Regions:
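Active-site loops and adjacent core secondary-structure elements that bind or stabilize anionic groups
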Residues: 1
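Charged, low-complexity intrinsically disordered regions
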Residues: 4-219
Length: 219
């Protein structure tokens, strides 16, 4: 299972929080789509921002705000070195050139960067841009980071993605994630994974064989 330091070295989204940040829990699984079997790990990140606020007596006090962020890290070899973000994690993120596409709606909705102009141009097909605009309507503050290692980090603010039919909340995290590992039905998660599979189908034209999860990929 990934550690936060490992995640933050590969993806900017795990660098949130100017005070503290930690992975509350993770859960591993696979999704079998019509063409590809996708290995994924779900992560629940909790991070804290702090700032100083001046009180009525002129003194300053430090105020802490806690936030939750959710993500799926998926084996995704078809796209590398591209970042599409509707919500930038922090001002400390590496400065990268922003690429403009032919879609004004997309340019207004996303910060689109990459390792090279060629990688961005190959990724930004009209069909993909339309798909991402629809994804933004489905998930709050959605970000997609395609690493050079062949992984996709799909991150968002929607806690409901991991909601399940039985009563329960994040109040008892160990039990919650233990149930997930045991195969608890997650009706809101698999539609999101189906969207990831749809994106894979848009970009797997250079691959002759469907992707299957191997022991090496699971490590």
């Amino acid at each position: 299972m990934y550690k936060r330091q490992q995640l933050s070295s590969e993806f900017d989204d795990y660098d949130r929080g100017n005070d503290s940040r930690r992975i509350e829990a993770s859960a591993r699984g696979t999704y079998q789509g019509p063409r590809h079997q996708l290995s994924f790990v779900f992560h629940h990140l909790r991070y804290v921002n702090s700032h100083y606020k001046r009180k009525s007596d002129g003194e300053s006090e430090r105020v802490y705000e806690s936030f939750d962020r959710f993500s799926l890290v998926v084996d995704f070899p078809w796209v590398r070195g591209v970042m599409v973000r509707s919500d930038l994690p922090n001002t400390k993120s590496k400065k990268r050139k922003v690429f403009e596409t032919t879609s004004d709606d997309f340019n207004r909705s996303f910060n689109f960067t990459g390792d090279s102009e060629l990688a961005c141009a190959k990724f930004a097909t009209p069909t993909t841009l339309a798909f991402l605009l629809e994804l933004r309507r489905r998930l709050k503050k959605v970000n997609l980071e395609f690493s050079s290692e062949g992984h996709l980090c799909l991150s968002f603010d929607d806690a409901e993605v991991m909601a399940y039919k039985d009563p329960g909340t994040f109040d008892d995290l160990p039990s919650f994630y233990a149930n997930i590992e045991q195969g608890l039905p997650l009706p809101n998660l698999f539609p999101v994974l189906a969207l990831v599979h749809e994106l894979a189908e848009l970009h797997d034209n250079n691959f002759d064989l469907p992707l299957k999860v191997t022991d090496e990929m699971e490590q």
